[in-house]
Regions:
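N-terminal leader/signal peptides at the extreme start of proteins
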Residues: 1-10
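Aliphatic-rich helix starts adjacent to a transmembrane/signal segment
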Residues: 10-54
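Low-complexity, Gly/Pro-rich coil/beta segments used as flexible assembly/activation regions
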Residues: 43-172
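Edge beta-strands of extracellular beta-sandwich domains
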Residues: 141, 220-231, 327-331
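Extracellular beta-sheet/turn segments enriched in Thr/Pro/Gly and aliphatic residues
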Residues: 152, 229-258, 262, 331
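Structural motif
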Residues: 160-173, 256-258, 263-277, 283-288
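Short, acidic Ser/Thr/Gly-rich low-complexity loop/linker segments typical of extracellular
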Residues: 181-203, 284-308
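Short Pro-Gly-centered beta-turn/loop motif in secreted/extracellular proteins
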Residues: 195-219, 299-325
Length: 331
């Protein structure tokens, strides 16, 4: 008698299904392992950043109060405004902001009662950045530093910088640069407005028309102060700020988001006219006697008769033809 034997095995489809399942499981395990590594790296970098910030705060707590300030800052001191520090092969950018704070328990500068020494305490803010770290967000740490002795009347003043948009609304987190090369030591500050669109520089050294202020950031227009020499001898509409002893100087700068102007040059048959030369001028003045316009530039359309200007601020603009062949008929 012949006995028929059957051999157990896998068909091609079963083999493919098994291989697919094994591959899916392997990918899942690998992805989970990779995610664990990412989380561990994030925890490690945050721990390093936190330790670095605590180290900086401890240094500040142990230096004389008069030295608690930034190099070329207000208040002036021994702490660098920016510094790169390497820890465990990670390069961290350490930014230090130190501001004089005016508390209202003894009055405020310009208030009632008037505080003739408004620099009551110093607010220290340390930001730790890491460009090479994955899944890392900038960490910020703050601390308040107070003097041991009773304050005396200040011989300095205050500069309050307000930033608003075209609708008069305050603009928070606007980048502010403040420079004064006439003082000893010089002042060079990079900071931001608060939630109310204000940056208060308290206990600033007195100086006449020498505090240069600029407000602006990516995607926004820039507004700044000027000296007469910056604009060819005209009188600045927004001159460099003056700070007087025990007085508050208030400066308002208006900024808004950048816009785009698209210009096309065509003839009477609506055919493109290439390389058309024209002048584009806004109405905003940065100087008078004689007038100096904030935007006053000569431009030309492309060979296809078009031009796009993408870094334009809000204003009313006038087009004046300066082309040797064509004139402007309508708009």
């Amino acid at each position: 008698m012949n006995m028929m034997r059957t051999k157990a095995g896998l068909t091609l489809i079963e083999t493919l299904i098994t291989a697919f399942l094994l591959m899916a499981i392997s990918i899942g395990i690998f992805s989970a392992f990779r995610q664990i590594l990412v989380v561990m790296e994030s925890i490690r970098t945050r721990s390093l950043a936190t330790a670095l910030a605590n180290e900086r705060l401890e240094i500040i707590r142990n230096i004389p109060y008069a030295s608690v300030g930034t190099v070329s800052g207000i208040p002036a001191g021994v702490i660098p405004q920016e510094e790169d520090v390497i820890r465990n092969n990670y390069t961290f950018q350490v930014q230090t902001f130190i501001r004089n704070i005016d508390h209202d328990f003894d009055g405020t500068a310009g208030g009632f009662p008037n505080d003739t020494s408004p620099a009551d305490n110093k607010l220290v803010e340390i930001r730790i950045l890491c460009d090479q770290c994955q899944n890392y967000r900038t960490l910020a740490f703050t601390a308040m530093v107070a003097p041991k002795n009773v304050e005396s009347a200040s011989t300095n003043g205050s500069l309050f910088i307000y930033v608003i948009d075209a609708n008069g609304e305050p603009v928070s987190n606007m980048d502010i640069t403040l420079d004064n090369g006439m003082l000893i030591p010089e002042v060079h500050i990079n900071d931001q407005t608060n939630v109310d669109g204000v940056l208060q520089i308290i206990d600033a050294p007195p100086a006449v028309s020498s505090y240069e202020v600029t407000a602006g950031k990516s995607g926004w227009t820039e507004n700044r102060t000027y000296s007469s020499s910056d604009i060819g001898g005209s009188i600045p509409v927004f001159p460099h700020a003056t700070v007087l002893q025990q007085q508050i100087t208030q400066l308002t700068l208006v900024v808004d988001r950048l816009s785009t102007i698209n210009i096309e040059s065509v003839d009477e048959f609506c055919a493109p006219v290439g390389d058309f030369d024209f002048n584009l001028r806004g109405t905003k003045l940065i100087g008078t006697t004689p007038d100096v316009y904030k935007y006053d530039q000569s431009n030309a359309t492309s060979l296809g008769g078009s031009l796009s200007l993408s870094t334009i601020e809000w204003d009313t603009y006038t087009i004046t033809p300066i082309d040797s062949t064509y004139d402007l008929v309508g708009s």
